[in-house]
Amino acid sequence: VLVISIWEKIGVLHNHFLVHLPPITPNGLIIRKAMYVYDDLDQRIINERVAQFQDQMDRYLDGKIPEEEFLPLRLQNGIYVQRYAPMLRIAVPYGMLNSQQLRIMAEIARDYDRGYAHFSTRQNLQYNWPKLEECPEILGKLATVQMHAVQTSGNCIRNTTTDEYAGVIAEELVDPRPYCEIIRQWSTFHPEFAFLPRKFKIAVNSVEGADRAATRMHDVGIQIIRNEAGELGYRVYAGGGLGRTPILSSVVREFLPEEDLLTYLDAIIRVYNQFGRRDNKYKARIKILVKALGVERFSELVEAEWEHLKDGDGKLPSEELERIKSHFTEPDYL
């Protein structure tokens, strides 16, 4: 975990990994380049979530919601209660920020924390000294720059990560960020996967021969490849992780067609949701399930589940993929 004075280091970070933006236009719109932009539905969902959590917080502070009921509500909004103060974890999808987002996070660090924040190893940002009652207000400020803390904690699908130089590194097969964004949109508020046996982490890599996203240390790793016919698709890994039981993931499918990304992920997580342990949180990650079943048996279960899904509504339409890709233009210096 990298600890920085976010206010003082803002200039240094600009030069390293930020997208620079023109100013806000007269109608209040932010002109963005090279990253996904919320549409009206995206923004409305986040605004409604902030208002909902503000109401839940008010009722909790008034004693109308007991502690055990408030626990999953705060976790769903990225809040851990630690020894001295709450910790609020902010999602930074596939590690990409623009300058306005970083400035808002710096203001939050200055006004609601102690001038510091932690960038985590999985491309999130954490505040360690906010007041619990001020967290909805913080989330409201983040919503103004299209950020949130949804699914940054709890037993759900977490932030999808990729290479920190995605989109600019010469060795990548294609830009992996559109695929990360597709996974983000699919997994956020997914009703079936809100209460998994344990947290679930996905990483995407697009450099063949170099695991630049540490995909084999994730619950699911997606390696973008081309088959012998030149078709774009994925090699899929499952069952990796660190912690007290570090395991490198295994290949569960050598080639998955590009349009089948979400249906196959759906199948993997359904198998995990059904067979993963819930009696011991230290043995509840998918890596333990894959090891217990064996990768061959686990793959058979996934393939059987996928048979029911692969020709359904979850197949990724080419026009939707192109729409997402259109947000990720090359920077001027390439």
Go through the PLM ranges and name each one.
Residues 3-4:
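Short, low-complexity, intrinsically disordered N-terminal modules
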Residues 27-334:
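Peripheral terminal and linker regions in Fe-S/redox and tRNA-modifying enzymes
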